[in-house]
Amino acid sequence: KVCQNNEALAPLIKDLPDTEYGKVSKETLWKNLEYFLKAVVPEAEKIGMKLAMHPDDPQIDTIRGISRIMTSVENFIRLTKMVTSPSNGITMCQGNFSLMGVDIPATVKTFSKLIHFVHFRNVLDLSGNKPSTKFTETFHDEGQIDMYAAMKSYYDIGFKGPIRPDHVPTMAGDSNER
C-alpha cells in the first residue's frame, strides 16, 4: 500500500513560504474560476468538449498561501451552477470524495450527467476526520468504498464516459520516491 499521508504533508506544506503571488483568498479563486468558466465553457460547447474539475488533492486548506476551494460536494455544486452547461462538469475522483465523508453512490446520483470522467480508486481513512487528514491508497477491494455499489451507480445513471483505475498501491520493486 502507498501511504498518501496528508497529516505528514500538512506540516511540511504549512511551513513553505507563500508563492510570488502572496496569499490568494477563496473569494479570489471563486471570482477567477467564474471568469474562466464564463470565457471557456461556451468555446468548449462549440466543439463538444467536456471540462471535468478534479477535487483538490491533498485536501489541505491552503498551499503556499494559495487557498483551495474544490474540497466539498457543496463547492462542486457551486462550480456546476456558475455556468450551467453540459460542458461544465466534474471528475468523480472516488477517493477524494470518499475522504470528504460522502457516500459515493449518492454523490454519483447527485452529479449524474455532470460526471465527465471517473477516477475509480479506493482509499482507507486513517484519521477519523472529515475531510480526512491521513489516508492510505488501497487496492480496489481493500478500501472503504463499496466498489460494486459505485460501479452500479455509474451504470444506473447511464454513464458512458472514461473510467480509469487510478492510484494503485506501490508494487514490489516500484518506487514513488523522486
What residue ranges belong to the model's regions?
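Glycine-rich, aromatic-flanked loop segments that form ligand/cofactor-binding clefts
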Residues: 1-12
